[in-house]
């Protein structure tokens, strides 16, 4: 039966075109003589600083500050062994009973490292009446450190909930009087209130923290120089990778083969940077970028072009996972399906050479699950059905894509993704579920209005409005509260998941951080704001001045 006998009505989204053109297509590598030796010498100096601070207990608070600076400057991957050793020594020495300065920093760094230290240390911040001490209210840096520590809280930590309210209120007051605060610190406070450190992407943080750090009289010249050199070296690698994927994308020719779908290869690579910016994850970034570009085409086909009958055929083709399915598809779907098959076949062959077919099969099942649930959404849209949250969530948490994207990232990390890790991933761990909830809720908050202008499945907002009999504004309030709460669940699972390599857990955290950036105020992936555009340029266009 021909599907073209009658011109179908399509839910066209009118996506804006790419703003980048061929800007990143060509990359000319620039070799700076002697930089590698300079970097190696600087790294030796930093290692010595870490050793000296660790060897003297009186300097352990300074050690924490040094580690924090290394991480925020974007160079911790050079000192992973030293940082791991230092924080392990700190934990073995003090346990939960830290008695030095910078308690908030100690708490944040230990939890970030995976040590589930208690929050009892913050009882020292309160007076005999249970209120936070006035001396803390007058300590701007102390307030900021405590505020940042609260983002590591888990459900039930009341003292950190109180601390969040206290610090947020005091810091907000300070932003209303710019003249009473150091200008650089004033900017730091504004950034923190907008997005605490734990919810910021490390690479973006490096781009923004390096200039701030340079303005501090106390900055370490060795650290600063190393951070700037490394930023530029990594940026060169990233631009080379981006050039590669842009050429791959141009060969697909989206304007010819999928003109109504989103042309977002640069944004896909930016997402890849969010999943891991370090040099050792180059392969992971390239494959992740290609996969996200293909997944975006598939998602748009379901959301913004395909008819219900066409989508049933495409779903069956994905289930069969065979290039022989091309002949069964409508003409416009064939280039998309072929690109999909070619992209995943490339990775399958690579992993097969490493003896990791198990890892590829894990990723493949997540793709199939994603498409099956897109089909459920298409069915709801076709029927005009608004499901309850109980019916809605199991489907839309999957179609939000967080789980799929996490496992896609893992395909490029086969060296640390053990067989036990595969079993963990396919078991639908709570960490995946909570990151999926976060992604879905943030997406729905920012895409709801645009999606409801065409035939589209209902969002979380509509399910909340229907189930709780509330208006849209109140439903948004409920979802923002859920987003805040689900971060606490994510933190708990991050801290309590055992026997899984920490980089795999951090890949989930990086994804959550990226979602916070991507959906900051709008759906920047689809309709980019000026601030988001500047973030991309800060990582991929503008080098650090040395």
Curated annotation (Swiss-Prot):
GO terms for molecular function: amorpha-4,11-diene synthase activity; magnesium ion binding. Mg(2+) 2 binds at residues 299, 303. Pathway: Sesquiterpene biosynthesis. Mg(2+) 3 binds at residues 443, 447, 451. Mg(2+) 1 binds at residues 299, 303. GO terms for biological process: diterpenoid biosynthetic process; response to gibberellin; response to reactive oxygen species; sesquiterpene metabolic process. It holds the Pfam family Terpene_synth. Belongs to the terpene synthase family. The Asp-Asp-Xaa-Xaa-Asp/Glu (DDXXD/E) motif is important for the catalytic activity, presumably through binding to Mg(2+). Involved in the biosynthesis of the antimalarial endoperoxide artemisinin. Catalyzes the formation of both olefinic and oxygenated sesquiterpenes, with amorpha-4,11-diene being the major product. This is Amorpha-4,11-diene synthase. It comes from Artemisia annua. The lineage of its organism: Eukaryota, Viridiplantae, Streptophyta, Embryophyta, Tracheophyta.
